[in-house]
Regions:
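Short beta-edge/loop segments at beta->alpha junctions of small alpha/beta modules
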Residues: 1-75
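Nucleic-acid-binding surface
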Residues: 54-212
Length: 212
């Protein structure tokens, strides 16, 4: 296959799986060799086995980190610090894209960034939504679920000290009823205690706003 043929086949898709090249009467070994050559030539990036992205200046669309993360591990969604930063709930700029997944924990370094996956139980793989990102789409935890996921996975995450260190802001974006509803799925005193602390933080910030 010629590289221009690959570009035509991929079109505007920012990420592609090698399986799309194996349709029809083709030799898988030759396809793998060709992909390896394109990687070495700097024409494509290998994100993980079988997963690739077109490299500049050939790419039509730069893949969003959230989209990449969704492809790196199936049954995953953006959560924790990445989602909280995306919603403006914490002030920090996050340099690693964090997700939760039913798969194994992983820390992946790719040509397009670093990606971390934390494991959660299958029954907790809820509370996410499809987000539009400049024409791309990715699964991202709702604000409330991103916060609960972080507290659940962080040792001592329910402590008053840790919650204050998060420096939560724009807490009006958090739905109190959703917090109370989603915490029931975790069924753990740790999260119940944390929600009480969060509601107090939200209340105090609301009072501060009213005093201005």
């Amino acid at each position: 296959m010629e590289f221009n043929s690959l570009l035509q086949l991929i079109g505007d898709e920012p990420i592609f799986d090698s399986s799309i090249l194996l349709a029809g009467n083709v030799d898988p070994k030759l396809i793998r060799i060709q992909l390896s050559r394109w990687v070495k030539a700097g024409k494509i990036y290998q994100l993980r086995r079988g997963l690739y992205s077109i490299a500049p200046p050939y790419q039509r669309i730069q893949p969003h980190p959230f989209l990449i993360a969704n492809h790196l591990q199936k049954a995953s969604y953006i959560s924790l610090q990445s989602a909280l930063s995306f919603y403006g709930l914490i002030p920090e700029v996050v340099n690693i894209t964090t997700s939760v997944s039913t798969g194994r924990p992983e820390l992946l370094d790719t040509p397009l960034g670093r990606f971390e996956f934390r494991h959660i139980k299958t029954e907790l793989l809820t509370g996410y939504q499809m987000i539009e990102l400049s024409g791309q789409h990715a699964l991202v935890a709702r604000p409330e679920k991103a916060l609960l996921d972080l507290i659940y996975l962080q040792p001592g995450g329910d402590s008053n000290v840790y919650l204050k260190e998060l420096r939560l802001q724009n807490t009006e974006k958090l739905d109190k009823d959703l917090l109370r509803k989603q915490v029931q799925k975790f069924n753990t005193p740790k999260l119940e205690n944390a929600v009480k602390e969060i509601l107090q933080i939200m209340s105090s910030k609301s009072e501060e706003f009213e005093d201005l």
